[in-house]
């Protein structure tokens, strides 16, 4: 075997080893790339799910906030109406002799009965 053929054989072996190493490295990189893509897809799905859940929670909080505001406004309107009615009645009976007499027991019982039925039908706002 001559020096040229030995050099050529050595270059061929070196090229084969180098090509094999590069081929292995390329295959390993492809496998890692596929794994990273799957992990990225899983993380993106988890993020989308979390965003969807958070959006649902935000909408729920907005609904409850609107309900709370409506209840507060209704309570304030009821209080205002009650106060206005009380003032109108007080003004209307001022100076009338019926304002100094006690309410008959039968009338008071009837009013209590009406109040109980009204609260039972519409719910007791004092309990809310």
From Swiss-Prot:
<keyword id="KW-0578">Host cell lysis by virus</keyword>
<keyword id="KW-1188">Viral release from host cell</keyword>
<keyword id="KW-0204">Cytolysis</keyword>
<comment type="subunit">
    <text>Interacts with the spanin outer membrane subunit. Part of the spanin complex which spans the entire periplasmic space. The spanin complex is composed of spanin inner membrane subunit and spanin outer membrane subunit.</text>
</comment>
<protein>
    <recommendedName>
        <fullName>Spanin, inner membrane subunit</fullName>
    </recommendedName>
</protein>
<feature type="transmembrane region" description="Helical">
    <location>
        <begin position="7"/>
        <end position="23"/>
    </location>
</feature>
<keyword id="KW-0472">Membrane</keyword>
<keyword id="KW-1043">Host membrane</keyword>
<feature type="coiled-coil region">
    <location>
        <begin position="24"/>
        <end position="51"/>
    </location>
</feature>
<dbReference type="GO" id="GO:0031640">
    <property type="term" value="P:killing of cells of another organism"/>
</dbReference>
<keyword id="KW-1030">Host cell inner membrane</keyword>
<comment type="function">
    <text>Component of the spanin complex that disrupts the host outer membrane and causes cell lysis during virus exit. The spanin complex conducts the final step in host lysis by disrupting the outer membrane after endolysin action has degraded the host peptidoglycans. Host outer membrane disruption is possibly due to local fusion between the inner and outer membrane performed by the spanin complex.</text>
</comment>
<keyword id="KW-1133">Transmembrane helix</keyword>
<keyword id="KW-0735">Signal-anchor</keyword>
<dbReference type="GO" id="GO:0016020">
    <property type="term" value="C:membrane"/>
</dbReference>
<keyword id="KW-0175">Coiled coil</keyword>
<keyword id="KW-0812">Transmembrane</keyword>
<keyword id="KW-1032">Host cell membrane</keyword>
<dbReference type="GO" id="GO:0020002">
    <property type="term" value="C:host cell plasma membrane"/>
</dbReference>
């Amino acid at each position: 075997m001559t020096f040229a053929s030995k050099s050529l054989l050595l270059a061929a072996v070196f090229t084969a080893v180098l090509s094999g190493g590069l081929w292995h490295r390329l295959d390993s990189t492809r496998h890692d790339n596929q794994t990273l893509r799957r992990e990225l897809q899983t993380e993106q799905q988890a993020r989308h799910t979390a965003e969807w859940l958070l959006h649902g929670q935000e909408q729920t909080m907005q609904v409850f906030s609107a309900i709370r505001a409506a209840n507060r406004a209704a309570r304030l309107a009821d209080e205002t109406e009650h106060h206005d009615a009380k003032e109108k009645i007080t003004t209307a009976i001022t100076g009338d002799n019926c304002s100094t007499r006690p309410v008959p027991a039968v009338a008071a019982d009837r009013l209590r009965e009406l109040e109980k039925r009204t609260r039972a039908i519409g719910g007791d706002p004092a309990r809310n």
